[in-house]
Amino acid sequence: MRRMDFKPVLFFFFVFICNQPSFSTHKVYILHGYGGSLIQMDKIDKGLKHEGYNTENYTYPSFKECIDSIGHDLFVKIKQENYDTVSFVTHSMGALVVRSMYKYINPTMHFPFIYRFIMLAPPNKGTEVADFFSNSSLRSFLGPNVSLMRTDSNSYAFKLPIPTCEVGLIVGVKGKKPWFNPFMPDDNDGTVTMKSAILGNEKEIITVKSMHILMPLKKKVITLVLRFMKTGTFIKNSIINN
């Protein structure tokens, strides 16, 4: 009787294992957006913890400190904690904070492998809301970051590094209703349009019917976050109905 050669099977199994992150030293950082708080991201944090992930619901002074400074603080913290692998879940401006962190990483230094990055409604190409308030009398009261999120091609948001990891993008839409936000010509969540959220290197993009500020609290959004973190994919349907 001819014996089966298991060497090819063992080889491919070894390659598969080597390409998986070391989840014993994998940490997921969760970041709120401009004016947000730990409470806003608490359900996502608890959902990931329930699935066995080591997480940190990371907060920062979004009204007082500029994005570059916050990104540097995050970089220093992650480097000091020295996990093998890190992932991110961000809402709104939190995505820009993580993108700014990339500026401080160089190939010669030891820095954890960045595995997955799930963005909820990120103003990757700015937001018309920032355009409006950047030119208003309220600008001085809103802190340094509003003007950094303008939509013009020379703005700060446009110049940030593009993530090199697996990116999953969740964008909020409400339909093209002029009464929803008169400042925005395209489909939007009240703050960020789909067009301004997209970077172009996403592994997957999915839309949900949600207002901007409520997105991290939605059960279906949390389900999508958990699914992408575990599998690297959302679901087949491109729109999740409430």
Predicted regions, residues:
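Bacterial N-terminal signal peptides that target proteins for export
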Residues: 1-9
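Sec-dependent N-terminal signal peptides
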Residues: 8-17
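Sec/Tat signal peptide C-region and signal peptidase I cleavage site
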Residues: 20-24
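Serine-dependent carboxylesterase/thioesterase catalytic core
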Residues: 26-34, 55-61, 65-164
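The serine-hydrolase catalytic nucleophile loop
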Residues: 37-43
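Short aromatic-enriched loop/helix-cap "lid" or pocket-rim segments at secondary-structure transitions
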Residues: 42, 69-70, 127-133, 178-183, ...
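A short, Lys/Arg-enriched amphipathic alpha-helix followed by its capping loop at the start of a domain
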Residues: 43-53
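C-terminal catalytic-base region of ester-bond hydrolases, centering on the histidine
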Residues: 161-242
